[in-house]
């Protein structure tokens, strides 16, 4: 392995994922729910941006100036391609952390984000990042950091260690990481078949291994097979970040803000008896067996008064991004599946059903006559946002300014969808971030952009693209061989797209 990789998997690219938690706009809802002042973000940085999908969607869909690095030049090259296509001005580099963090041309940042990368890097790189946060995060600025944590990883970490040891020692010379992963997974199967005491003491391990076997190999390579891989207790994370002068603010997982769906009454009572915030978080991790944390930290957190908090919450704009009829009145959290009250959620969803952004003050006016209190409205928005049905919306003026760059990026992405399904997201200047749009939907949008008006025309366009490349639709695990079967499936999907998805994409300024 070449020295520049520093033990990090580099012979296979990371997935083309989008992570909404990296959207600085989300900070507002989380911080206001926690009673904290949320910064206005003008400059942002992502360290270890992978393929750069999140960084580019956020840069193109907002007026925030984005900077970032990923030391894999192939990934950085793709990220730079997207930045050039959008004209967002995002500054995306292929520097090492040490080189990037010492660049003299970087501004100070309102927001710095790291998704997952903390768990996969060396202590030396962690020290570089902590020093960077100390120097470059503004007072009042927010750090988003997600990482593998304990105790949730304590059961499977030993097998992960064995997988990487096997890949490093038993993999044939000259074979790629995918072949080494397959060999390691096969060996783990053989091991568990011998019924070792380890798996008998940890009965969830075989099921977890089966889950791994079904996952994308690019994902597994980066998540599990780096030389450095360190799940970390929350208290250890707090010690690492202390020199950066940041303190824990709140969870970036919005559902974590609602104790009633995560903790039983006894657990809630125990946590209330713990005065120390860090110990409280540590104990909570044991209660929910936390495996992956998504946290916001702040440099100089400030509490809002109850009046300031209520006023700021009422100014938030939100938009429904799921068809009203498709929103289930159930949500899954640490305690399992919880039901949502029709009396509360029904009026809130009805008020948002046209997919137009509305402030919480407007929603309060629209639902108060139906017996919904502001506290209930606030929690409903929080849970709906955490479940992925509602997103925060930018001011109309900001959305208007971002429209040109988001349109350019989307045009580039839907054109690329002709040849690949790699990037399943497009930019929304309404939400300031990405929105899931699969390959076929992107091809339908491409057909519309070329003048096709009807769903049947979109389906024919998509089929022409697929057929020219010898591609077929996979339905229920099997390829559709006949052209008429492929076209029939595409027509059905195009009609559903026209009825359900297109109105939302128009409301989000994606279409």
Predicted feature locations:
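Short, amphipathic alpha-helical interaction segments positioned at domain boundaries
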Residues: 399-450
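A short acidic, Gly/Pro-enriched loop at the edge of an enzyme's catalytic core
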Residues: 102-112
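Conserved beta-strand signature within the Rossmann-like core of class I S-adenosyl-L-methionine
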Residues: 140-148
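Short acidic, hydrophobic short linear motifs in intrinsically disordered regions
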Residues: 357-367
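Conserved SAM-binding loop of SAM-dependent methyltransferases across substrates and taxa
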Residues: 51-63
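A short glycine-rich, Lys/Arg-flanked "PGG" loop and its adjoining helix->strand segment in the class I
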Residues: 127-139
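Conserved class I S-adenosyl-L-methionine
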Residues: 147-171, 184, 191-197
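Conserved alpha-helix/loop element of class I SAM-dependent methyltransferases that forms part
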Residues: 10-42
């Amino acid at each position: 392995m070449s020295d520049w990789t520093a033990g990090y998997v580099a012979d296979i690219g990371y997935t083309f994922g989008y992570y909404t938690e990296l959207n600085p706009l989300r900070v507002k809802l989380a911080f206001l729910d926690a009673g904290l002042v949320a910064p206005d973000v003008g400059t942002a940085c992502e360290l270890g941006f992978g393929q750069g999908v999140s960084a580019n969607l956020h840069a193109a869909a907002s007026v925030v100036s984005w900077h970032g690095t990923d030391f894999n030049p192939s990934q950085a090259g793709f990220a730079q391609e997207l930045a050039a296509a959008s004209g967002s001005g995002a500054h995306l580099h292929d520097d090492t952390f040490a080189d990037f963090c010492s660049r003299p041309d970087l501004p100070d940042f309102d927001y710095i984000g790291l998704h997952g990368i903390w768990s996969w890097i060396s202590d030396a790189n962690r020290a570089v990042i902590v020093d960077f946060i100390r120097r470059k995060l503004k007072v009042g600025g927010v750090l988003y950091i997600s990482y593998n944590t304990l105790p949730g990883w304590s059961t499977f970490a030993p097998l992960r260690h064995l997988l990487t040891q096997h890949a490093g020692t038993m993999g044939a010379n000259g074979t790629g990481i995918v072949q080494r992963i397959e060999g390691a997974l096969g060996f783990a199967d053989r091991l568990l078949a011998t019924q070792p005491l380890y798996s008998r003491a940890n009965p969830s391990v075989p099921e977890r291994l089966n889950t791994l076997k079904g996952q994308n190999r690019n994902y597994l390579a980066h998540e599990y097979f780096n030389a450095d891989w360190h799940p970390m207790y929350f208290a250890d994370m707090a010690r690492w970040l202390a020199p950066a002068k940041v303190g824990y603010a709140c969870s970036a997982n919005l559902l974590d803000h609602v104790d009633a769906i995560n903790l039983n009454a006894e657990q809630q009572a125990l946590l209330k008896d713990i005065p120390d915030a860090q110990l409280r978080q540590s104990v909570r991790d044991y209660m929910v067996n936390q495996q992956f944390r998504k946290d916001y930290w702040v440099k100089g957190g400030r509490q809002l008064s109850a009046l300031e908090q209520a006023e700021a919450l009422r100014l938030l704009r939100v938009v429904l991004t799921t068809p009203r009829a498709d929103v289930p009145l159930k949500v899954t959290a640490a305690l399992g599946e919880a039901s949502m009250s029709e009396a509360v959620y029904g009026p809130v969803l009805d008020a948002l059903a046209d997919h137009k952004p509305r402030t919480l003050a407007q929603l309060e006016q629209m639902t108060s006559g139906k017996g919904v209190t502001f506290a209930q409205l606030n929690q409903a928005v929080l849970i709906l946002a955490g479940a992925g049905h509602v997103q925060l919306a930018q001011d109309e003026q900001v959305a208007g300014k971002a429209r040109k760059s988001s349109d350019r990026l989307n045009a580039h992405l839907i054109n690329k969808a002709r040849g690949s399904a790699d990037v399943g997201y497009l930019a929304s200047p309404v939400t300031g971030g990405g929105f899931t749009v699969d390959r076929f939907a992107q091809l339908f949008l491409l057909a519309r952009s070329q003048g096709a008006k009807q769903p049947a025309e979109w389906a024919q366009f998509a089929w022409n693209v697929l057929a020219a490349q010898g591609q077929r639709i996979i339905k229920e695990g099997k390829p559709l061989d006949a052209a008429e079967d492929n076209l029939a499936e595409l027509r059905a999907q195009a009609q559903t797209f026209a009825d359900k998805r297109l109105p939302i994409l128009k409301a989000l300024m994606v279409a």
